[in-house]
């Protein structure tokens, strides 16, 4: 260190006290004589209070005469002699001004004169002057004493300044010795010195040679000169070589080699080191070369592998191109549909995945070529798949053509039957329907082909043109044109399908109510022939609509579609139905009452369910005749005999063969289109019949007559294994409700939502027949048309259906108005995997439960998953008998509409349906859950008729369950939606196609984790929250770092749930040049209640560092938490924090929060906490400002034994050094809190303070607090202000005193302090030694004794007492003094 720094620090340390004393003495004399009198009263207690005199003028205030402390700049500029001269001159000026102000002190020179004047006045005034004179005399004596005291003080200060000058000289000498350590040599200097040494050596050699050269021989001289010239060349070459070596090492070696080459001289040893370094460099380069060679070999192998792969791909490409060419030739003549595009899209995805995998392996040079090849391969694969799809479509087209033939034959037979009945009106209507059907069939079939061709022509394979062609308008009897709305193009139909399906889940409650809306609005009915014609138009067009996955044209009002794959979609107008529910209910009740009177119990054709798939024309005619006749038992008997006809059996065999062929072609994805092969032959993903859409839109026109066409709920059905049965049923039901008179008792489309996933939908002709079943005047002419269409009962006993129908018609109470129209029992759809008995039961139950009111059958949403139909029958029969038998217009309308056999047994769902119908009171608008588990019902509850049916249906259910389980396994494997597959009914293997169509393979449910980071202009907020629920460890740690403009804020919050629960919080704020570090640690204990608190605050002027440490320990000695936050200013770096937590189980916690400022560094902090017996905590926080260094802080906590840990680390700044602070806390003994406030100015130094428990008074430990006079300098600051302090004893001794012993006793210190002995010599003999008191700031109320033992005392300055009762202490720590135990770094 420089001597100037130590001079400043020592002057700071010791000069403050005399400066303050002088200030107090000088300032109190003129301004407050009362205070002066009090100071004198301390020695002379009998003196009377002195007279008050006027204060000196403000312009001559004593502050003007304060001695300025020379700053560092002035000390650097002025020599010591000039500085001493200035101080002496200033002191003389102060003395002269004081004499002028208060008078001269020569033996009361002025005061007797003052007394004389007062005496003269006393003669005139009288006795009062006597007292005044006495006061004047006393004041004169006091003034003389004060002047003497001031003179002594000034003289002592003058001598002290002289001594201080000598002291500075000694310190400067000592510092020069201590600073003799050479600084780190500069490399350039060392190299220059070495070069100079070499040149000097060469010069000496040349000089010697010249001296030894012979003068006589010139030749010898010439030869020597030649040698001299050659040698420098050799030296130059060596130097050049050495320079090259150094350059090589600098370029390739590490710092170690650079240092060696730079610092060491060019000796043999250094050269060997350099060569070794070069060898290491070469070795490293050789290793790198070897690694590069190995990498090259690996890359070559990979390249060869990629070439092989490329060749294989090229060969495959050629093969695929050939196949592509073949497919292109075939593609021109074959139609296509949306399924081809979707299949192509899935292949494209697979090919893309393959291409990505292959591209990763390929080198970047060939990626472009490979991409092109892969695109071609993908095209080939697409075309190949399209070829297969087209082949399947050809087969489907043939089957559809065959269906069309059957339909034509059926309609012709139906027309003949109607004419034979003699009913001209119905005959005319049927004729119109036939013509319309034929015309539309002829129109729709070419349209279908055109759409397929147009879709095939779409080379991109993208489903961009998923639209349904607009179809010709159909004129209704009302005269309005019903336009078939063209569906919009959709880039991703899967998204729209999914969105509608999701909406359908929310609006499932509106399904049944929506059906009633159409019934309420049907004020006038349409003739059955009209509705029949409209429904017939849906036959041919439905195929095309089903092929296209158009989702946009959902049922417009009353239709709810349950997709077989997901959930029932939302009907667009279902909300409107809810508004008019109550009105509809009232209207339907009135209508049912009227209808009951006019309707007859036409138990119509129970045998229709026994009809075969290929709709025998004979059976159709019989059904029509039976429905057109009055309800008579003779017709029932005739119809009962119909299923036994040989023609029906032939048709059954034909249908079975057709279904087998269809299954083979569709990979079991198409479940035999046995149901209505003439109409429905629905594709796996056939969505809906276009004619159904037309029927719905026709129904929307509600002029006078809202003919309630149960508007094809399958309109939106993307039905893989489903056919349009429910659509026709819905239409029939709504048309039945429309009667001439208000007899609209519609069992309103209970099964509107029913989607027969694995069931062939009822024939659309059945829908038409049902629609035509509207009551005309006296009776309901229900054209049970084409019962055979629906009668494909693969796994059903047709006999059981008839029995169930007959039994339930008998069971139904035929009391008042109980006209149960067992209408179209034959219309029950052929449920491939469902018992037909359950269908009939569902129909009977639903129709019976509607008590005179249009009770919508709640089976709309019911989907029966592997449920026994027997239990359903039981529930149905029970609930049919139980409801009140009044005014029952229960029309068994389309009983099979309610059955959605998606591998479900209809038993439990019927039970649920019947229960909800009975409990719902009048409305019963309750939608059932999609999947209801089996509810086994014992045979005890079965009626005798049901037991018979049970025995018959057991075989069917067993077969059904076997197939269901096998297909269920396939479908589960095919399903790529793990989240929804569990809640959905099982599906056939064609589910993969559905997934491909909807792009559902892309749908993956992911967990979203939200992460937030806020980045301002220069602000970064990071929040970490860690929670550990283990027994001993911490629970929550939260870190929030905020970076301001030049500010770093750290906040740590840790919470522990272990036994020693701790809580710790820190908050710190940083300003322009200020560092506030607040550390608060709270340790909660269970055994020992008292706490230990240590509080430290450091305050600095311009560069202030504040440390706030609050440590509270409440447990047995186990501290579980440490919290630290350091705020760093402009140029400060915060170090890491290490915390080790040890509880019942050892847990180590290491946390590093490291921030970097401009170029300064902060030390790390380490805390070690141990469990029950001892707790060791070491805390070190170093903050470095511009010129300030704060030393480490060490805290050691010991529970049972008294130990002390001392940490001596000093950091040195420009002018200021703050020493370490060490505190020792004892657990079982009474602890004490000592707040230390350290004020650091521009030239102040804070030393090291050791504090212990107040219980130990016998030991004195006050290290580095030797406030010796030798280390004090600089009394005065620039502006001297009055301050208050207690002084015990001031001993002024001559400088000849060789040794001084300083002892500081305090109740806080328990260890003996090391006595500091030093001998000081002073030049002049008249100099005196003044010992000024230490100003230690401690809590008020604690006294401090300072004993300065001196051999001789010339005189004692009078002590000045403070006006404040309690003494206040101010600790001015000076740490940079040259103390013996202080090491220098």
Swiss-Prot record:
The keyword Coiled coil applies. Residues 353-364, 437-455, 481-490, 573-589, 665-676, 685-697, 712-726 have a biased composition (Basic and acidic residues). Residues 425-436, 493-503, 511-528, 536-545, 654-664, 701-711 have a biased composition (Polar residues). Expressed in epithelium of normal cervix and cervical cancer. Overexpressed in early and interim cervical cancer. Pfam families: BioT2. Residues 299-330, 374-411 form a coiled coil. May play a role in tumorigenesis. This is Coiled-coil domain-containing protein 7. It comes from Homo sapiens (Human). The lineage of its organism: Eukaryota, Metazoa, Chordata, Craniata, Vertebrata. The gene is CCDC7.
């Amino acid at each position: 260190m420089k001597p100037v720094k130590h001079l400043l620090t020592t002057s700071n340390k010791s000069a403050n006290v005399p400066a303050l004393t002088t200030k107090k003495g000088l300032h109190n004399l003129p301004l407050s004589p009362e205070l002066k009198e009090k100071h004198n009263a301390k020695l002379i207690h009998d003196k009377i209070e002195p007279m008050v005199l006027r204060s000196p003028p403000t312009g001559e205030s004593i502050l003007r005469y304060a001695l300025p402390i020379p700053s560092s700049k002035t000390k650097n500029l002025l020599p010591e002699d000039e500085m001493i001269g200035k101080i002496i001159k200033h002191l003389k000026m102060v003395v002269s001004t004081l004499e002028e102000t208060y008078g001269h002190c020569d033996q009361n020179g002025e005061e007797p004169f003052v007394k004389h004047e007062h005496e003269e006045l006393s003669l005139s005034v009288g006795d009062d002057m006597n007292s005044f004179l006495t006061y004047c005399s006393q004041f004169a004596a006091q003034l003389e004493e004060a002047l003497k005291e001031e003179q002594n003080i000034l003289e002592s200060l003058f001598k002290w300044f002289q001594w201080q000058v000598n002291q500075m000289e000694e310190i400067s000498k000592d510092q020069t010795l201590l600073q003799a350590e050479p600084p780190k040599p500069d490399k350039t200097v060392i190299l220059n010195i070495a070069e100079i040494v070499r040149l000097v050596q060469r010069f000496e050699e040349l000089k010697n040679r010249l001296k030894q050269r012979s003068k006589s021989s010139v030749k010898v001289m010439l030869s020597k000169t030649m040698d001299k010239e050659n040698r420098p060349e050799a030296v130059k070459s060596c130097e050049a070589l050495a320079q090259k070596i150094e350059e090589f090492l600098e370029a390739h070696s590490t710092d170690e080699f650079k240092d060696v080459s730079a610092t060491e001289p060019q000796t043999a040893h250094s050269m060997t080191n350099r060569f070794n370094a070069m060898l290491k460099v070469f070795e490293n380069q050789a290793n790198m070369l070897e690694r590069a060679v190995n990498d090259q070999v690996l890359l070559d192998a990979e390249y060869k592998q990629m070439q092989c792969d490329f060749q294989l791909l090229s060969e495959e490409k050629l093969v695929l191109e050939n196949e592509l060419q073949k497919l292109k030739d075939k593609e021109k003549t074959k139609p296509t549909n949306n399924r081809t595009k979707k299949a192509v899209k899935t292949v494209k995805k697979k090919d893309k995945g393959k291409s990505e995998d292959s591209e990763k392996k390929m080198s970047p040079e060939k990626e472009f070529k490979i991409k092109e090849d892969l695109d071609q391969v993908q095209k080939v694969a697409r075309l190949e798949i399209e070829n297969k799809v087209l082949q399947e479509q050809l087969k489907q087209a043939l089957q559809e053509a065959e269906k069309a033939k059957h339909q034509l034959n059926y309609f012709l037979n139906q027309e003949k039957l109607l004419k034979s009945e003699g009913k001209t009106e119905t005959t005319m209507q049927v004729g119109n329907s036939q013509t319309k059907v034929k015309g539309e069939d002829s129109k729709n079939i070419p349209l279908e082909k055109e759409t397929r061709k147009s879709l095939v022509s779409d080379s991109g394979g993208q489903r961009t043109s998923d639209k349904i062609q607009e179809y010709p308008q159909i004129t209704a009897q009302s005269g309005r044109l019903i336009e078939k709305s063209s569906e919009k193009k959709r880039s991703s139909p899967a998204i729209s399908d999914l969105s509608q399906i999701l909406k359908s889940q929310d609006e499932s409650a509106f399904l049944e109510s929506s059906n009633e809306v159409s019934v309420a609005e049907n004020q006038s009915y349409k003739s059955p022939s009209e509705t029949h014609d409209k429904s017939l138009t849906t036959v041919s067009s439905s195929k095309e609509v089903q092929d296209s996955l158009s989702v946009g044209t959902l049922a417009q009002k009353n239709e709810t579609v349950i997709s077989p794959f997901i959930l029932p979609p939302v009907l667009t107008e279902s909300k409107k139905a809810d508004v008019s529910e109550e009105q509809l209910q009232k209207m339907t009740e009135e209508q049912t009452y009227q209808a009951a009177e006019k309707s007859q119990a036409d138990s119509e054709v129970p045998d229709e369910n026994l009809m075969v798939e290929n709709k025998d024309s004979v059976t159709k005619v019989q059904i029509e005749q039976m429905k057109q006749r009055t309800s008579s038992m003779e017709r029932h008997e005739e119809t009962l005999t119909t299923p036994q006809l040989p023609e029906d059996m032939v048709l059954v065999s034909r249908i079975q063969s057709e279904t087998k062929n269809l299954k083979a072609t569709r990979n079991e994805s198409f479940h035999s289109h046995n149901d209505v092969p003439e109409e429905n032959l629905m594709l796996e993903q056939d969505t809906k019949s276009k004619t159904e859409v037309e029927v719905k839109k026709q129904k929307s026109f509600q002029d006078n007559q809202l003919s309630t066409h149960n508007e094809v709920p399958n309109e939106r059905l993307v039905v893989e294994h489903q056919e349009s049965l429910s659509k026709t049923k819905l239409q029939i039901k709504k048309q039945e409700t429309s009667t001439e008179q208000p007899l609209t008792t519609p069992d309103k489309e209970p099964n509107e939502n029913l989607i027969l996933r694995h069931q062939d939908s009822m024939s659309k002709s059945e829908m038409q027949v049902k629609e035509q079943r509207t009551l005309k005047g006296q009776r309901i002419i229900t054209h049970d048309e084409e019962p055979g269409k629906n009668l494909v009962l693969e796994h059903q006993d047709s006999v059981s259906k008839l029995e169930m129908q007959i039994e339930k018609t008998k069971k139904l109470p035929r009391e008042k108005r109980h006209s149960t129209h067992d209408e179209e029992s034959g219309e029950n759809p052929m449920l491939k995997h469902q018992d037909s008995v359950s269908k009939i039961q569902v129909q009977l139950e639903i129709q019976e439960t509607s008590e005179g009111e249009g009770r919508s059958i709640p089976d709309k949403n019911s989907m029966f998953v592997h449920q026994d139909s027997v239990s359903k029958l039981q529930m149905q029969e029970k609930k049919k008998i139980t409801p009140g038998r009044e005014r029952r217009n229960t029309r068994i309308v389309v009983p099979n509409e309610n059955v959605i056999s998606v591998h479900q047994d209809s038993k439990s769902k019927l039970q649920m349906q019947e229960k909800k119908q009975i409990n719902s009171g009048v409305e019963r608008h309750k939608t059932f859950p999609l999947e209801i588990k089996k509810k086994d019902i014992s045979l005890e509850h079965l009626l005798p008729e049901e037991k018979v049916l049970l025995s018959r249906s057991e075989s069917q259910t067993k077969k059904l369950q076997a197939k269901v389980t096998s297909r269920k396994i396939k479908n589960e494997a095919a399903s790529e939606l793990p989240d929804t597959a569990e809640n959905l009914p099982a599906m056939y293997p064609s589910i993969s196609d559905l997934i491909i169509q909807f792009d559902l393979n892309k749908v993956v449910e992911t967990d979203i984790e939200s992460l937030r980071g806020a980045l301002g202009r220069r602000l970064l907020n990071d929040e970490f929250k860690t929670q550990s629920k283990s027994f001993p460890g911490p629970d929550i740690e939260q870190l929030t770092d905020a970076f301001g403009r030049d500010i770093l804020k750290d906040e740590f919050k840790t919470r522990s749930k272990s036994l020693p629960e701790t809580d710790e919080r820190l908050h710190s704020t940083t300003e322009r040049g200020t560092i506030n570090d607040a550390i608060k640690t709270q340790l909660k204990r269970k055994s020992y209640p008292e706490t230990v608190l240590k509080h430290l605050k450091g305050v600095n002027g311009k560069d202030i560092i504040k440390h706030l440490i609050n440590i509270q320990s409440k447990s047995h000695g186990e501290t579980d938490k440490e919290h630290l936050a350091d705020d760093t200013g402009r140029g400060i770096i915060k170090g890491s924090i290490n915390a080790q937590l040890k509880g019942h189980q050892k847990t180590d916690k290491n946390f590093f929060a490291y921030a970097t400022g401009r170029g300064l560094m902060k030390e790390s902090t380490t805390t070690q906490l141990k469990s029950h017996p001892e707790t060791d905590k070491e805390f070190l926080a170093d903050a470095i400002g511009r010129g300030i260094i704060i030393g480490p802080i060490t805290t050691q906590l010991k529970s049972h034994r008294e130990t002390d840990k001392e940490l001596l680390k000093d950091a040195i700044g420009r002018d200021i050094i703050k020493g370490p602070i060490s505190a020792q806390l004892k657990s079982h003994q009474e602890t004490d809190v000592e707040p230390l406030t350290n004020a650091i100015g521009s030239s102040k130094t804070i030393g090291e303070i050791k504090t212990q428990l107040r219980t130990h008074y016998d030991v004195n430990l006050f290290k580095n607090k030797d406030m010796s006079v030798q280390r004090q300098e600089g009394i005065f600051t620039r502006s001297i202000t009055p301050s208050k302090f207690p002084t015990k004893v001031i001993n002024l001794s001559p400088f000849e005193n060789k040794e001084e012993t300083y002892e500081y006793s305090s109740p806080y210190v328990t260890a003996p302090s090391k006595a500091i002995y030093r001998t000081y010599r002073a030049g002049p003999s008249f100099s005196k030694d003044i010992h000024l008191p230490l100003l230690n700031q401690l809590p008020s109320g604690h006294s401090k004794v300072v004993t300065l033992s001196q051999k001789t005392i010339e005189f004692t300055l009078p002590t000045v007492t403070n006006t404040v009762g309690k003494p206040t202490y101010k600790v001015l720590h000076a740490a940079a003094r040259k103390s013996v135990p202080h090491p220098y770094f």
